[in-house]
């Protein structure tokens, strides 16, 4: 995962993350960063600010649900305010003819232009007269472009009735993730889990290398491939023999065809896990049980409720089976569908874990309302939300 500035830049008490999945990305960050997070703020939908104590940069490199990470180095009352502290820092990493950019999130066009002007003036006052300004489409330099254009990118967003700014210090290796989705023998479809989302879900499980993750609705194995890449032992189950074969081919491809005993994928029923596992408990379960049919138009609310109702029994029966098979300190991560209707309603499949001895996972100082919705999805009228359960102690 590329650090585009020295890791010491992140040795600060405030960092900002540009979110890939909205609140789900915040949940992932609170899980991965753990006790280093003392407070989290959501100044806008695209960016969250985390107050941290003694944050090892290696934790940042584990994140999948963030597009960028930047320390908060300047907070301005107005877009034309002095930003010497930021531009002085930038000048120490720039040479004349270096590329610079400003990525503005939920900032108006006039304020964005004023911020760009203030940034350039500050850099030039520091003695760099020939830096090149990249003007990104939509006022946001995408994370991959930060790397390909070798730009010193500044993240800016509304904060405390003013603006917060900081240099992008880290971006994820999005190209490698995308290749795992498109080059494997059985690529994921437009409506199935992306590798990035699958890795985010795996991170919510909070496992250490060598522990065991089970996906009881594994499909073509996207979650298992991402879990294996984190050195986890992988168990996969699917009721369709064709999908079991696809999952085996994909995970074998992901490790270069090497024969390995770190995974086991078999045909079976997710509602009978305890019998299948012969009473063995797994460290985590991460799964998307059923992908509803792709919709070509928003359904009526009554139709959406009927669709959810037909799937609810499978989900709840499977959750009961998962509860019997999870280790006492493990987690269960389940994706559920959210249907947007023509009347403007959202119909969500809800899960109840209390009677199964489960409670909702709440990391650190932030309280989450479940199911946690994904933002910025392109799946049109069927979207996703996520439950994370853990056994009651």
Segments from the language model and where they lie:
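Short, charged beta->alpha transition segments
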Residues: 79-94
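DNA-contacting interfaces and partner/effector-binding or oligomerization modules
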Residues: 98-106, 110-112
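Generic hydrophobic/packing signal
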Residues: 104-106, 123, 127, 169
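A gly/proline- and charged-residue-enriched helix-loop-helix capping module
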Residues: 113-139
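A structural signal for short, well-ordered beta-strand segments and their strand-loop junctions
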Residues: 101-103, 130-134, 164-166
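Class I S-adenosyl-L-methionine-dependent methyltransferase catalytic core
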Residues: 2-69, 75-82, 108-117, 140-393
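Phosphate-coordination loops involved in phosphoryl transfer and adenosine-cofactor binding
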Residues: 96-99, 209-210
